[in-house]
């Protein structure tokens, strides 16, 4: 698992107890965390949590938009990491508005993975929650609706060029 995250962060996390600071070590250089991009810093923190044994069976991980500020090419690695953690007994709650992240979860989960999709809607000061084992089966699915809207615009644009 850590090897996959190291591909994203392109290094390892170090902690300097004298300065009470984290660093990202790349080769012979090290950068303070506050100088590292948000996406890389986020992945480095996950790396550190896994390495320190904080994300083991019985742990709970809440992660708001893991795909934010991350190269889209790394989304499959993040999904694989989250599914592996879940299979090892970590309960994971993820919020996302990203079509690709959602579809990668759907594509890579197995029948034995316990993945649920939730859609939260607020209408007239009333919160409604919809839950499904399949992403595409959520009736109120803003992510899919946005993807469909984009698809229709692309088709319309292609038709206008002909």
Model-derived features: positions:
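Phosphate-coordinating catalytic segments in nucleotide- and nucleic-acid-processing enzymes
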Residues: 1-58, 123-162
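Short, contiguous clusters of charged residues that form electrostatic/catalytic patches at enzyme active sites
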Residues: 41-44, 76, 80
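Walker B motif beta-strand of ABC-family P-loop ATPases
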Residues: 60-62
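Walker B catalytic acidic pair
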Residues: 64-66
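C-terminal lobe/lid and adjacent interdomain/linker elements of RecA-like ASCE P-loop ATPase modules
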Residues: 77-162
